Every structure is written in C-alpha cells, then in structure tokens.
C-alpha cells in the first residue's frame, strides 16, 4: 500500500470466481486507486487465467506467482504469459539470485513492455524463529536489505516486503516501487501471517 497516486491492491486470495467478481464490483468505483492481486490459487483455477485476461485495461493487475527456478525456466514461464497483456506486475523470489532476476527482467521486456517485475523478499508468514529454521543466521531485516540490494542491481522494478522492513530499504531502493503485503485492520485475524501492519501503520 502506498500514498497519493500509487495503488492499493486488493488481495483476491480465493479460487471462487463469484467471490472475485463480488470483490471487483464492490471496489472498482472507489475514489482510491485500486488494483487487484491474483495469486496461484485463482490463477490455476478453472476460470482464473481466462478471467484475468479479460479484465478491463484500466484495472491495475498484479499477478503474484512468486516464480523461483533456474533462469531458463523462469524466463520461459514469463514468455508463457504473453496473452495476459493487461498484467502490470509479476512477482519472482529475490532468493532465486541475480541471474534468475536478470533473466526475468529480460523476458518481461520481450513479452510485455509494460510488465514490471517485483522481487519478493522474506514472506510475511516468517517470524525470526521460523526463518532461522530454514538455515538463515541473519535477522529478517538484514536478509530483506541484502535481497533488495540484489534486486536493485538486477534492475528490477520493485520490492515486496512487509511494512516492518519498508523503511529500511527506502534509502537503498530510491526509485523502485515498494509494495507491502500483510495489511490487516485493527482486530482482524492474522491468519498465517506473522509480520503484519494496519493500513495507517503501513502509510
């Protein structure tokens, strides 16, 4: 979530087409700049890809696929999205490394010139305890800073990190977009999220 002319994305985290249609109907005429984030759950559903491809051009569409594989495979995966000309953002994992991120950026330029590649850093479902269980010895903040710096060198368009790390990377990623997931209203259930913020805290 960001201020002024930037976009507030509504997370369409369901495989239900009727629920997605309801979400869009309720928000499409908002005075705010609203975009829609679609993850693997809806993208891989029966109507997902077809529905996304038919969304009006004025809708800001974020395809949150979090790609991570060898550079060639990620590149091919992005080329396979060439029919989705209305997608504005696509996520890949920063932990895939420099070569993978550069390959993704090159593939995006050939597939859809307006497609921006976002580097996902540490998922908001991780706590300091659970990130160490994966073999990391650094704090989440240090990992995010390191990954954001790498994404900048790879010339990606933006960073996805929790609001808790956003301030720390603003000075590093000056012209890159920073998108903060894990936004909850006061009193909402956190679900499987660990590092969350309210909208006012995120702003």
How would you name each of these model-derived features?
Residues 2-5, 73-79, 84-158, 162-166, ...:
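Conserved anion-binding
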């Amino acid at each position: 979530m960001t201020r002024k002319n930037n976009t507030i994305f509504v997370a369409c985290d369901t495989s239900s087409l009727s629920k997605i249609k309801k979400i869009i109907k309720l928000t499409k005429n908002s005075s705010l700049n609203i975009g829609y984030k679609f993850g693997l759950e809806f993208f891989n559903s029966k109507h997902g890809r077809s529905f996304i491809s038919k969304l009006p051009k004025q809708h800001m569409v974020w395809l949150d696929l979090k790609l991570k594989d060898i550079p060639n495979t990620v590149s091919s995966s992005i080329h396979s999205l060439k029919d989705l000309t209305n997608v504005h953002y696509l996520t890949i994992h920063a932990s895939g490394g420099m070569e993978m991120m550069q390959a993704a950026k090159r593939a995006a330029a050939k597939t859809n010139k307006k497609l921006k590649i976002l580097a996902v850093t540490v998922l908001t479902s991780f706590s300091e305890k659970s990130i160490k269980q994966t073999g990391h010895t650094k704090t989440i903040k240090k990992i995010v800073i390191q990954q954001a710096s790498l994404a900048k060198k790879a010339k990606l368009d933006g960073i996805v990190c929790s609001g808790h790390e956003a301030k720390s990377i603003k000075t590093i990623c000056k012209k890159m977009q920073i998108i903060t997931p894990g936004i909850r209203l006061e009193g909402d259930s956190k679900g499987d999220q660990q590092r969350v913020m309210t909208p006012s805290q995120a702003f």
